[in-house]
Amino acid sequence: MHHSGKGAALVLGIGNILWADEGFGVRAVEALHQAYEFPAEVKLMDGGTQGLYLLPLVQDADILVIFDAIDYGLPAGTLKVVDDHDVPSYLGVKKMSLHQTGFQEVLALSAITGRYPAKVRLIGVQPLDLDTYGGSLTEPVRSQMEPSLAVAIRFLMEQGFPSRRRISGCVPESLCPPSVNLAHYEAGILVGGR
């Protein structure tokens, strides 16, 4: 599979899976990776809470897609899409965790250095629960997983990066360690531990 556009795309899931809905971004990019194949120029990444460590990756991207739990002040589970230079202001609306401050800085430094992606899309979902340590995604947030993936797929296609559903049984290596795989995490299965 190849793309007809130029450059490279980075699809980032940011957030902290240990705090319930705060893990939406990471869970979304992992679900996208498990279900779809993209051209080699598309990098899917669990950005977690890495903050400034993501700067070189963002600077090298022509197209940036971000999945994150964002407190828009809307009903829980509301899916909201924000584009381009409006993205940093939405990441700073109401900070829910330190990763949002760190990622705002990544975008600001990318702009200051003149290496800001040509197109940026934030796919955010209003969280319900950010206080349950060890909690998983709540139903209102989980219900927006497929619609959020569809938004990303359509956007990437519009930018010249087509996707293809993975063939059943052809599951790629996970973006995150097996111990934090959503199914294992929710079942309390410790992979590789004692």
Positions of the model-derived regions?
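Conserved active-site and cofactor/substrate-binding residues in soluble primary-metabolism enzymes
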Residues: G23, R27, T49, L74, ...
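Active-site and ligand/interface coordination hotspots across diverse enzymes
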Residues: M1-A8, A183-R194
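Residue-level signal for pocket-adjacent positions within structured domains
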Residues: G13, L74-G77, V93, V125, ...
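Nucleotide and nucleotide-moiety/phosphate-recognizing core
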Residues: S4-L12, I17-S89
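Phosphate-binding/catalytic loops
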Residues: F103-L190
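Helix-loop-strand module that forms the ligand-binding subsite of alpha/beta enzymes
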Residues: A69-V120
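A generic membrane alpha-helix/interface feature
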Residues: H33, Q59, D86, T101, ...
